[in-house]
Structure formats: structure tokens, C-alpha cells
């Protein structure tokens, strides 16, 4: 991982993260070819972990080996009327980590260290205009 700075999350953000099971991870090859994939994830309060049943065969795995910069988005619709999207977008660096107790059991995971975050409708009430 690049830096020692730890990004912190508000209690509202942590509650939202823990209420969701699906996210999207965006990676890029060393040439800059982009890829985005829906993924399950774990959050330990500091890092996000992304696994897969055959992780080492995925584009995201290969891309992280070549280029550690990633984006990670957790989002949903809290309501349709009024229209209330919610999201937490993370930018950060990723590496590979072996975990004994991840959501898929003992395995290799992509570990994401958040360095920047942007939220919509999580830390304050949504006001429809």
C-alpha cells in the first residue's frame, strides 16, 4: 500500500457500508484499459476486501497486479419517490492479501486502502428539489 494515512468513516457511512453486500470495483491495466465489475465485499473498519471464487482468473486481479489504483462504489436507491440515490465512492490503492476469515472463507482477496471518498445522501438527509 502507498501511504500510511488512514481514511476514517463517519458512523453513518459505516452503517451504510455494513448494510450493503454488493459494490463495483473499477481497475485499469498498466496500459490504462479500464474494467469495472460487480463484487461482494467485506469491510474491517479500515480496508475493503474483494474476493471471488476464481479470483486469480479475473481481469480485476490481473489489473491490480499491474496497476494498484482502483475506484470502488457502493450504491443503492433508498427511494424512488422521491428519487433518493445513495452512494459511497472510494478511490485508493489495492494489493493482494491472504485472509483466514473473509466472507468467502480462507482465500486470497483484493485489499483496498481508501485514500479519498465522496458520499451522496448518507451523512445528511436528502432534500429533493
What label would you give each PLM region?
Residues 1-22, 129:
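Extreme N-terminal tail/first-helix region
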Residues 5-7, 53, 95:
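Short gly/ser/thr-rich secondary-structure transition/capping motifs
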Residues 9-12, 36-37, 57-59:
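A generic local structural motif
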Residues 17-18, 49, 109-114:
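A generic structural signal for ordered secondary structure
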Residues 18-20, 33-34, 87, 103-105:
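Short solvent-exposed loop/turn micro-motifs enriched in small/polar/acidic residues
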Residues 21-55, 72:
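Short beta-strand segments
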Residues 55-116:
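Short, structured beta-strand-loop surface elements
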Residues 109-129:
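Flexible glycine-rich active-site/ligand-binding loops centered on an Asp-His dyad
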Amino acid at each position: 500500500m502507498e501511504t500510511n494515512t488512514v481514511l476514517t468513516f463517519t458512523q453513518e457511512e459505516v452503517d451504510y457500508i455494513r448494510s450493503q453486500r454488493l459494490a463495483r470495483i473499477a481497475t485499469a491495466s498498466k496500459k490504462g484499459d479500464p474494467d469495472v465489475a460487480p463484487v461482494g465485499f467485506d469491510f474491517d473498519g479500515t480496508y475493503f476486501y474483494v474476493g471471488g471464487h476464481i479470483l486469480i482468473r479475473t481481469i480485476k486481479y490481473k489489473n491490480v497486479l499491474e496497476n494498484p489504483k482502483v475506484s470502488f462504489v457502493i450504491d443503492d436507491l433508498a427511494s424512488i419517490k422521491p428519487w433518493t440515490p445513495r452512494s459511497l465512492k472510494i478511490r485508493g490503492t489495492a494489493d493482494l492479501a491472504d485472509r483466514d476469515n473473509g466472507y468467502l472463507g480462507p482465500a486470497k482477496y483484493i485489499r483496498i486502502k481508501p485514500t479519498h471518498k465522496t458520499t451522496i445522501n448518507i451523512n445528511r438527509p436528502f432534500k429533493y428539489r
